[in-house]
Amino acid sequence: ILNFKRVVFGPRNEYSEKSIVRICQSLLELDNTSEATTFLERLEKSAEAKENLIYAVSNLMKIYYNDKKYNKATLYGEKLTSFNEVDNRIKSDAYLFIARSSKSLGNKKKALNAYKKLENDSNKEFAVEALYFKAMDNFENKEYLNSNLIIEKISSEFSGYKKWTAKSLLLMSKNFYQLGDAFQASFILESVIENFSHMPNIVDSAKNELTKIKLIESEKNSSVEINN
């Protein structure tokens, strides 16, 4: 790194930009994000090659997100989406970080708009996260049937993504309960408990929801058992 720094801090020449990139790469490999940020910002300002500018902006976006500096992460994500001729995978990354950052900042509208760009993304993991957020938004807006339709899509087309499938089924049980179908809601929760034992957090959530339903229903009908 020291040799590259000598080039960077010396008179600008044909090796200056390449040296900054190499420094950034080395610092990121060492997980020295603090110093990497300094050189990435320098690269962003001075880059002549488009791919180096994109490299700088993309990594700054990720660093700021991981540091919970969500406003800056969003800013750099938006810079990426504004560039022409950017690889679709890089743009998808940008929309994902914009969505997650906006969600963390409580800007649900902006998060929804960013997630919408990912609903049909070739990266299935991005797509299923986007669809889940849409289903959750429908639930919060009391659009329970629409939420369930999205969850059915997740279950049928993204069954390999177990975390999102499990979270979606938990949400589906809430939808059914809000629709007045305590039996179906309970059935789904019992299925989650049985089939996702390798996900203790999911199972705990399902058990808690099932207990709540049984307690509420027991007040309506004393024949409903409270205990599992």
What is the role of each PLM region?
Residues 1-228:
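Acidic, polar-rich low-complexity tracts and alpha-helical solenoid repeat scaffolds
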